[in-house]
UniProtKB/Swiss-Prot annotation:
This is Probable exo-1,4-beta-xylosidase xlnD. Pathway: Glycan degradation; xylan degradation. Its main location: secreted. The active site is at D307. The lineage of its organism: Eukaryota, Fungi, Dikarya, Ascomycota, Pezizomycotina. It catalyses: Hydrolysis of (1->4)-beta-D-xylans, to remove successive D-xylose residues from the non-reducing termini. One of its GO terms (molecular function) is xylan 1,4-beta-xylosidase activity. GO terms for biological process: arabinan catabolic process; xylan catabolic process. The gene is xlnD. GO terms for cellular component: extracellular region. Keywords: Carbohydrate metabolism, Glycoprotein, Glycosidase, Hydrolase, Polysaccharide degradation, Secreted, Signal, Xylan degradation. Residues 1-17 form the signal peptide. It comes from Aspergillus japonicus.
Length: 804
């Protein structure tokens, strides 16, 4: 028997111990019981294409196509060897000199699941802010820089055998409902414009471009599709079967995945745990073949990985398959190429014996994975002449970390929610605010700064460390914890506040209550944090500033702080990464000026209690008491709106476009014109939204611009409140009259809407295109003529995925 098969047999008792007759109730339990080897971070090495057993095989011929090279490799496998390598932890084929490989690496906001050393070289990698904070900068270049640095560090670790060549990132699900525990991993609640832009910049940064000569790392767009709940009300993500209309699928739950495939050319997708409309995502031919490959133009030989344990989930808890061999067969035939788990490795033999699958079905998925590894230079030796990324090493990790982009991302993303003029604080060197009370469960945070999916960082700078280093006399007292109701430490916090010139409370939420497999039950401030803030506000003197930092990925209802005149300023700081303390400090002191904007809506606490978080319908519905979801459809009054963010200065916007009566475009002319620079006619620029932005205040500052569209005449009713069509960030607009020119292209398809059948349609009618929530500049646009379908939504038919 092949060595690879023997290696897997050694693990069989553990695997069977998992999958026995006393099944875990995964309709409630949200963590899959993965066997230890699935979680392994193995030492990686490269095939020897110079003198090893594969050296004469086509896989080692760099002039052949990636597909032909991968197919030639797979043709050498016995059936047992092929099946043994279909999981994320692949034992390789020792007789062929093919080393073990681990598909599962993470790079959400830095390297995770890397083989870090205890100290010295390869003992850390840069820990960036969580995506929800970086996205709040509304800076596409920044996201690309972050991803590029992550991929450089990933390749350096890979060359040392400490990290894989493909990563299970980015998470581009939308932060639809505020209780979601993994919203921190995403860019926010807007799908096509914000999340799609984030996906494009992150993926092209990770992969080294759109169509790079040398693929840097292979990114994975996850989780496809309709995944945005962990365990709300004891409904496990592993067993959720969500109902989504074709209209909402096309309009909200998949457009960012379309951009990832069609435009960014992502090399991998991950299918999700949940089922949609009765079909588990990893056995959903409509998702994995009809949409991804036939409609979204997923790259040739791009591969699909199941989320870890999701193939098993087709059987338990979904019950879509009668047993685990049938689940494995359903998934591979639908288009799930690699199983992050063990179902393929342990049950394909039975699936083949029963005739449910053939060797060709299994080969198809494995060839796709290894065609990617070919493109990544896995078989091309150690020479940098064959692949420039093979020369990267520890000095490149140190060099890219020294660029300080983690700090930059944090300061650019922090959002100023409220300010009565107290901020920025005067510095100790000016003879004011020499002492500061840092109070709250985030005041001395270190590991908390990283959020989830983090690796070892070079350093973690807490707020206490940062203010101490700046020369402040720091009075630190936690006062309370994230979720406690104990007031035992209130008195120490109140004493610290009385001893200081300035009070800063740092609290909110963290990964103890929002995390993978853990949703929140409420979006109110947890525990007794608001009570402590109220007491701090009540005792402070009128000339003593009280500033509150609301931390964490999800929003909490801060209406009590918004209305309390004694709370002088309120900011949102997310999970700010390794330099978080410095970023939080520098925003308060004015060393840097805030220009971030919320990428989610801050709802009143009652919102999360008024309807089911499993209601995936975006549009308001009186019957279900759904008040509408996201800024596009919410019918209530938010505490702070999507896109809200204040500055330390005053900006004025003016535009010659706004003086124009109206732009009129003929739909037939628009959709029949040549578009040599874009993949589709819908991606053509309709017009450029322009404005002059003048800083009339007293501080230099970046300016963030969000451009929205709205209509009350075009397309089907109901009509959304508005939707984002573009954004930009203007850097360092000079104070006292400095001016910068804003130019945001608005594509044809940004004015399109989605009909009930899921088709993306350009409808005739009148539209307004406006700058920011304040509508500082408004341009009127009219589309005339007959409506035109820009993207036809395919009919859902479940079947077997075809060959390429």
């Amino acid at each position: 028997m092949a060595v690879a098969a023997l290696a897997l047999l050694a693990l069989l008792p553990q695997a069977l111990g998992q999958h026995n007759s006393s099944y875990v109730d995964y309709n409630v339990e949200a963590n899959p019981d993965l066997f230890p080897q699935c979680l392994d971070t193995i030492s990686l090495s490269f095939p020897d294409c110079q003198s090893g057993p594969l050296s004469k095989n086509l896989v080692c011929d760099s002039t052949a196509s990636p597909y032909d090279r991968a197919a030639a490799l797979v043709s050498l496998f016995t059936l047992e060897e092929l099946i043994a390598n279909t999981g994320n932890t692949s034992p390789g084929v020792p007789r062929l000199g093919l080393p073990p490989y681990q598909v599962w690496s993470e790079a959400l906001h830095g390297l995770a699941r890397a083989n870090f050393t205890d100290n010295g070289a390869y003992s850390w990698a840069t820990s960036f802010p969580s995506p929800i904070l970086s996205a709040a900068a509304f800076n596409r270049t920044l996201i690309n820089q972050i991803a590029s640095i992550i991929s450089t560090q990933g390749r350096a670790f890979n060359n040392a055998g400490r990290f894989g060549l493909d990563v299970y990132s980015p998470n581009i699900n939308t932060f639809r409902h505020p209780v979601w525990g993994r919203g921190q991993e995403t860019p926010g609640e807007d799908a096509y414009t914000l999340t799609a832009a984030y996906a494009y910049e992150y993926i092209t940064g990770i992969q080294g471009g759109v169509n790079p000569e040398h693929l840097k790392l292979a990114a994975t767009a996850k989780h496809f599709a309709g995944y945005d709940i962990e365990n709300w009300d004891n409904h496990s993500r592993l067993g959720n079967d969500v109902n989504i209309t074709q209209q909402d699928l096309a309009e909200y739950y998949t457009p960012q995945f379309l951009v990832a495939a069609r435009d960014a050319h992502v090399h991998s997708f991950m299918c999700s745990y949940n089922a949609v409309n009765g079909v588990p995502s990893c056995s959903n031919t409509f998702f994995l073949q009809t949409l991804l490959r036939d409609t979204f133009s997923f790259v040739d030989h791009g591969y699909v990985s199941g989320d870890c344990g999701a193939v098993y989930g087709v059987f338990n808890p979904h019950g879509y398959a009668a047993n685990e061999p049938s689940a494995a067969a359903d998934a591979i035939l639908a288009g799930t190429d690699i199983d992050c788990g063990t179902s393929y490795q342990y049950h394909f033999n039975e699936s083949i014996t029963t005739g449910a699958v053939a060797r060709d079905d299994i080969e198809r998925g494995f060839i796709r994975l290894y065609a990617n590894l070919v493109e990544l230079g896995y078989f091309d030796g150690n020479s940098s002449s064959s692949n420039p990324y093979r020369s990267l090493g520890w000095p490149d990790v140190q060099k890219t970390d020294a660029w300080n982009i983690s700090y930059e991302a944090a300061v650019e993303g922090i959002v100023l929610l409220k300010n009565d003029g107290t901020l920025p604080l005067a510095s100790p060197s000016e003879g004011k605010n020499k002492s500061i009370a840092l109070i709250g469960p985030w005041a001395n945070a270190t590991t908390q700064l990283q959020g989830n999916y983090y690796g070892d960082a070079p350093y973690l700078i807490s707020p206490v460390d940062a203010f101490t280093a700046a020369g402040y006399t720091v009075h630190y007292a936690p006062g309370t914890e994230i979720s406690t109701n104990s007031t035992a430490n209130f008195s120490a916090a109140l004493s610290a506040a009385r001893a200081a010139d300035t009070i800063v409370f740092l609290g909110g939420i963290d990964n103890t209550i929002e995390a993978e497999a853990q949703d929140r039950s409420s979006i109110a401030w947890p525990g007794n944090q608001l009570e402590l803030i109220s007491q701090l506000a009540a005792q402070k003197s009128d000339d003593q500033p009280l500033v509150v930092y609301q931390m964490g990925g999800g929003q909490v209802d801060s209406s009590a702080l918004k209305s309390n005149a004694k709370v002088n300023a309120l900011l949102w700081g997310g999970y700010p990464g390794q330099s978080g303390g410095l970023a939080l400090r520098d925003i308060l002191t004015g060393a840097r000026a805030p220009a971030g904007r919320l990428t989610t809506t801050q709802y009143p606490a009652a919102y999360a209690e008024s309807f089911s978080a499993l209601d995936m319908n975006l549009r308001p519905n009186e019957t279900t008491q759904n008040p509408g979801q996201t800024y596009m459809w919410y019918t209530g009054e938010p505490v702070y709106a999507f896109g809200h963010g204040l500055f330390y200065t005053t900006f004025n916007a003016s535009s010659a476009q706004a003086a124009k009566t109206k732009y009129t475009f003929n739909i037939t002319d628009l959709t029949s014109a040549a578009h040599p620079d874009t993949t589709t006619v819908g991606q053509r620029t309709l017009f450029n939204f322009t404005a002059s932005i003048t800083n009339s205040g007293q501080r230099d500052s970046d300016y963030t611009a969000l451009v929205y569209a709205n209509t009350s005449t075009a397309g089907p009713s109901p009509y959304p409140n508005k939707w984002l069509v573009g954004f930009d960030r203007l850097a360092a607009v000079a104070k006292e009259g400095g001016t910068a020119e804003l130019n945001v292209p608005v594509a044809v398809d940004r004015l399109a809407r989605v009909d009930e059948a899921g088709n993306t349609v350009l409808f005739p009618g009148r539209y307004e295109v406006a700058l920011n929530n304040e509508r500082e500049v408004v341009v009127e646009v009219e589309l005339v003529g007959e409506q035109v379908v820009l993207l036809k939504w395919p009919e859902e038919v479940q079947g077997v995925a075809g060959d390429e």
